[in-house]
Every structure is written in structure tokens, then in C-alpha cells.
Amino acid sequence: MTETRTPPVPAPRTAPATRPAPGAPTAPPPPVREVWFATWPVVALFILSNAAMPLYGVWQHQLGFGSGTLTLVYAAYVVGLLGALLVAGVASDRLGRKPVLVPALLLGIVACLVYATAPSVAALAAARLLTGIATGAAVSAGMAAVTDLAAGRALGPLLASTGMVLGAGIGPVLAGVLSETAPAPTVTVFGVEAVLLATALAVVARMPLPRSRPGRDARAAAPATAGSSGSWVRLPAVPRANRRHLALGLAGFAPGISATAFVLSLGPSLLTGLLGTANRALAGGMALAMFLSATGVQFALRRPAVRTVLLVSGAATVSATLALVTAIHTGALAPLLASVVLAGAGQGAGQLGGLTLLSREVPAHRRAEANAALNAGGYLLAGALPVADGYLSDALGLPTAATLFGLAVAALAAAGAALVALRGKDAR
């Protein structure tokens, strides 16, 4: 009996889902609507990630803390995000997408409750930490679930990427509008977000993903690798053959997301000074414009080669940072608005290029960990930027510090574009 249950049938399934082995039995891919539905949990969790942004002024007034403490609260989010990326990708590839996504959404709902009732800075930092953990799971398991259900269709990386940037843009404007128009702003904003996360839980429950662990048969038939065994908590990585693909993805994505962090950290205060208003919905609208730009660019660039997409990212990121530095020194509105649109385009193109390259080249049973590696590299740079900028601003003044950081991000983007141009054959 035992011998009849263990024939070497799984061997043909060792190839990535995007490139099935010849002769392997293939099931029909899920309907396209399932790919769209799978994007919603990613959108919902990224709405949470930025929903707090317009409300920091409310908390500062209620809890009485300064800019230095605010920097530490932001850092709690980055710590949670990076910590989740150390384990979420591996766990998702070994256990499946749902066992990672469901706890992430539940953590997001808990974070909403803490935000809504935060009695202290410590509680606020705890909510940001939980938000970071939930977001880290979203970029690992959530985005991998979208590409899994796409079954090799180009729609998968596109929707996974646009879901992230669209959610990140909706969060600030939703929170800004509700906080200006509804009573009890923090309770209202995070009550609505908790409902959105509950609907995302329902979507995850009905996702037509396999019950078994993704890639389990592939790992059983293939020789042991660093991705199929070893520690559950580790720096996310990709197979040796895909390291060059990860490097090219990071060359566009890391400077791009750093530029959006740079613009978001300075843009609202500059806009407030230029227009003479502190309306929270206006700051949220600025963030939405940035991420709508990212979404639009991703749909516009869904057909060109990945190399072209990454080069567009580099050019847009360099232009965005130089435009913001110009706005800081001239006090002009036009370069500030240009920096918003260009930064969104830089992140959107870099993220789409990186995700497309990894989903195409990395085996399916390492896909979530590959997504985690891409995002860990990008968020590590983008997360460190506002913290370092805050301390350098105290020492040198805001204009000098912002100029130095803007030029540094521009230099990184230019170097990344040069790498892509030189290694174009690896980014088809």
C-alpha cells in the first residue's frame, strides 16, 4: 500500500507556475475575476498602512508629543514591516498564502482598535508596529496570492503592484476627509478601516488557492535548497540564479519608494506653507495624487519590456527629487506638484518592473520570499530616510538636509538606471 502511494509523479511540477514543464498536467487557470478579488486584501492592508498619516497632528495635540517622538512612532512601523518580511515570505511559501494572510488581517483589525482608542504614545507605537507586521505579510503572501491566481498572466504582477500603491494612496485621503467631516476622527477613520479589513477576510476565505502548501511537491522532488529548508526567520532571499533579477528590481524600486517617502515627509508641510491651510484632506489628496500617478504609470507600462519600465522609473525618480529640492529653495508650487507626480511614477514603474521580473523568473515555491526580499530592500532604504532626515535637519537645518538627501536619492536612482542599462539582457 505504501509503495503504491509514493510514485515519482510530482517531478514534472518542479517548474515555476509561469512556465510549466512539458507534458505536465495543467488545470485551467482561475477566472480573471478571482485575480481582481485577490487584490482587495492587499489594497485594504495598504489603506491601513497610510491611514494614520493625516491624523498625526490630532494625536500630537491630544497626547502632547513632539517631532522627535513622532519619528520614533514612524520607526515602529518600519520595525514591524521589516520584521514581518523576515518570516512572512518563507511562511507563505511553506504553509500557503491563507495561513499568513488571515492572521495579518486580524492583526490589522486589532491595530484599528488600538488606533481608535490610543491613550498614550506607547499605544500609538504599538498600533504602528502591528500595522507594519500586517503590511509585511501583505507584500509577501498577499501579492504572491495575486500572481498565483493569475497563473502566468501579465495581469498578476500588474494588479499586485497597483493594489499596493492604490491602497497606499486611498488611505491618507480617506482618513483626511473623514477626520475633517466626521466626529471623533480617530474612531471614525479606524472604524471604517476595520470594516474594510473584515471584508478582505471574507475575500481570503473564498480564494480558490490550493489547500496544500505551495510548491510542496516541487520541493519534495527537487534537491534541497536554501529556500526549501532552513530557518523560518531569516533575511528573505532568492535562488542564486535569480540574484541578478532581484538586483535589477531593487535598482528601480528602492530609489523609487525612497523618493515617495522623501516627498511625503516634506510635501505636506511645504504645501501647507504655500497655500496657507492646514486642512488634513488636502495633505491626503496630495498623497492620493502621488499614488494615482503610480497606478496610472503601471497600467501605461504594462506592455513594454521590463528594462524599459525600470529605466522610466530611474528617470522619473531623479526628476522627482530634483523638483522637490527646487521647491524647497524657491517656495514655488509648480515644482512641488511636479515632484508629487514624478515620485509616484518612479515608484510605480520600479515596483512593476521588479515584481514582473521576479514573478517571471523565480520558481513559484520561492515567489513570496522573493517579493519579501524586494520589499525589504526597498523599505529598508525608504524607512531609514525620514528618521535620518529628522536628525540631520536638527543639525544642519531643513533646507540643507533635504538638499543632501534629495541629491543622494537622485544619485542612487541614476546608478540604478545605469545598472539596468548595462545588464539589459537580464531584464527582458
Q: What are the residue ranges of the model-derived segments?
A:
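Cytoplasmic helix-loop-helix junction between adjacent transmembrane helices
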Residues: 127-164
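Conserved MFS/SLC helix-loop-helix module at the cytosolic interface between two early adjacent transmembrane helices
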Residues: 82-121
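A late C-terminal transmembrane helix in Major Facilitator Superfamily
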Residues: 347, 355-406
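Transmembrane alpha-helices of Major Facilitator/SLC transporters
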Residues: 282-306, 320
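Symmetry-related core transmembrane helices of the 12-TM Major Facilitator Superfamily/SLC fold
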Residues: 187-204, 402-420
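Helix-loop-helix hairpin linking two adjacent transmembrane segments in secondary transporters
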Residues: 152-153, 158-208
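C-terminal transmembrane helical hairpin of 12-TM major facilitator-type secondary transporters
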Residues: 308-352
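Helix-breaking motifs and short loop linkers at transmembrane-helix boundaries and internal kinks
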Residues: 64, 96, 117-122, 183, ...
